Amino acid sequence: MDDFERKPELSPTAATLWTESGADPIGDLKLWRDLYEDENGTTPGAMVVSREIVTALANAPQFQVTMAGGGSRPATEADVQAILMANGLPPMTVFTRRTYSGPVLPKDRVLLLPPAVDTDDWSGTALGSTFWGQTLTAEDPAWGIAPLDRPGIVLGAYRNPKPPMIAEIISDAIGLPVLEDPNLSLVAKVL
């Protein structure tokens, strides 16, 4: 796995994994939040987790909800979010995207990142951006694409005017993700 020259201390492992007895998820997250702030001069603005991590947090004693009569129940996702925010931690986003080869992000890691930006914000964040190039297809006058709209994905449909009446869909794009500051990401193993 390539770390893109991120400082090793920004890839910690919880002293006690969060599914084990005696784990301190809130303490771990506060420690990592402070480490992130010491490194970057700002606190993280987002926390990205898997569904498995939400389940581990919901079942942790620190997150259990005490019921009338002394019983308790595991926290809901909303309870977990509220407890994290009450402890000065960034909002949690559950990321479950998969590809044919498996999850996009490891299920056992918490990511602390800068705040999310709008997907149309071309400048991205200090962490990085994705830049769209302009293809030759986009420059073809037959498409009628305005110059400002040419960078990005070009998609079109053609239909053969003579038999066989076949429709053809074509697409073309140039995209380049650019990582500007890998130290704006902290990736901690917790499960």
Residue ranges and their predicted role:
Residues A15-E20, G69-L191:
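Sequence/fold signature of self-assembling virion shell proteins
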Residues D2-N87, P91:
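Extended, solvent-exposed, turn-rich assembly/linker loops in the middle of proteins
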